[in-house]
Design a protein with these regions (language model features):
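Conserved substrate/cofactor phosphate-moiety recognition/catalytic segment
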Residues: 2-40
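Hydrophobic/aromatic beta-strand patches that form the interior of the parallel beta-sheet core
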Residues: 6, 123-125, 172-176
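Conserved nucleotide-binding/hydrolysis micro-motifs of P-loop NTPases
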Residues: 10-13, 83-85, 129-134, 180-182
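Short aromatic-enriched loop/helix-cap "lid" or pocket-rim segments at secondary-structure transitions
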Residues: 16-21, 89-92, 136-139, 187-189
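Glycine-rich phosphate-binding loop used to anchor ATP phosphates in small-molecule kinases
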Residues: 34-119
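Short glycine-/polar-rich loops that comprise or flank the Walker A/P-loop
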Residues: 74, 118-123, 169-172
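A glycine- and Lys/Arg-enriched "phosphate-lid" helix/loop adjacent to the NTP-binding pocket
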Residues: 87-159
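NTP-dependent small-molecule kinase module
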Residues: 135-203
Length: 203
């Protein structure tokens, strides 16, 4: 099959700034109660745009390439994070912490029928990672907007991901160990990567 990979639209989030030059990531982490609803909508819109662009690209390729049409070649879209992840983890977490009020949360959830009428998510690959490892990677990434994120926030994100994806009978979920460091030349990590790829192919 042909594979299209959709990356996190973080460049879009960083490109929109206020009069003081602060971008959306920065103001969100500084004041979640003020910016949670706005940022979650931005995340939804930018992810949806990338997904729809990918679908339009597939339709164009299929239309132009007669062999794709004759052979019925399949396309697989792999998104860095599902829009449903935003809905079931980040937005719900912000609602439960009172950073997003009831009216905002209700309005936010009204967006999703627009997406789900066009797109059906088939599978989820969950790279389950210890919060301390995620925090370590976030610190190493050294993104200026994320420097004040506490470990507690990462632990909450992990908790909500686990609640949604572990033992979820409504979605096909492949849970993989995300704690391995695949950027090193360690033979054990390379073998773990090979095993992980094999599981994904079987999935």
């Amino acid at each position: 099959p042909n594979v299209i990979v959709i990356q996190e639209p973080v460049k879009e989030w960083l490109s929109i700034t206020d009069e003081n030059g602060r971008n959306f990531l920065e103001v969100f982490y500084e004041d979640k109660k003020r910016w949670s609803y706005t940022f979650q909508n931005l995340a939804y819109l930018t992810r949806m745009k990338l997904l729809f662009d990918a679908l339009d690209n597939i339709n164009t390729i299929t239309f132009k390439n007669i062999w794709n049409r004759i052979l019925g070649n399949k396309f697989i879209i792999i998104s860095e994070r599902s829009i449903l992840t935003d809905k079931n983890t980040f937005a719900k977490m912000l609602k439960d912490s009172d950073d997003m009020n009831n009216m905002e949360y209700s309005l936010y959830n009204k967006c999703f029928p627009v997406l789900l009428n066009r797109v059906k998510m088939s599978n989820v690959i969950y790279l389950q990672t210890d919060p301390t490892k995620s925090f370590e990677r976030l610190t190493f990434r050294n993104r200026n907007e994320e420097k004040k994120i506490p470990l507690g926030y990462i632990e909450s994100v992990n908790e909500y991901h686990n609640k949604w994806l572990c033992n979820n009978d409504d979605i096909r979920v492949l849970i993989l160990d995300g704690n391995n460091d695949f950027e090193t030349d360690d033979i054990k990590n390379k073998l773990n990567l090979i095993t992980m790829i094999s599981k994904i192919k079987e999935f």
